[in-house]
Amino acid sequence: SDLINAFCHRDYARMGSVRFLVDDDGLTIANPGGFIEGVSEDNLLTAQPRSRNPQLALILKAAGYVERTGRGVDTIYAGSIAAGGSFPDYSQSSAEEVILFLRRVVPDEAFVTMIGDEERRRGAPLPVWSLIVLSLLREHRRLTMVQLCDFSHLEHRRIVSAVENLVEAGLVEGDR
């Protein structure tokens, strides 16, 4: 999904290539053109989906390269977290280019197994919001709702809903 997003959302009015770099630190993907108007690093997951190149997005969907248009970033986050990795890093992006960095990590096998078991039990993938909460709790062990919102850059209502679902599933314990 990250490779497809780079080609689908690049600014074709700008010169330059989509660049991929795999090194000891991880995978970096850079494409010409900053984020689409109204989208920033802080609202990538919650901004209204829009494509810079809607015809290309439709072609990629028709060809089977994407399941749903407008959900590429969600898929990138979910895939990275569910594989035991860290959050995708867009912090080096600018008005001239979007840069995605996926850090190389040794997957936490217990975490990956827990996610896989829960997804099999549900018969569906965990929502990206739940994966974000689980990842943050794996890293920090104990967080308040305010801290979860701060670390995730997500709205309180999304975090509350995700935590409630995770508590109900028995994956996390909540304090009152």
Indicate where each model-derived feature is located:
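C-terminal regulatory or interaction extensions
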Residues: S1-R176
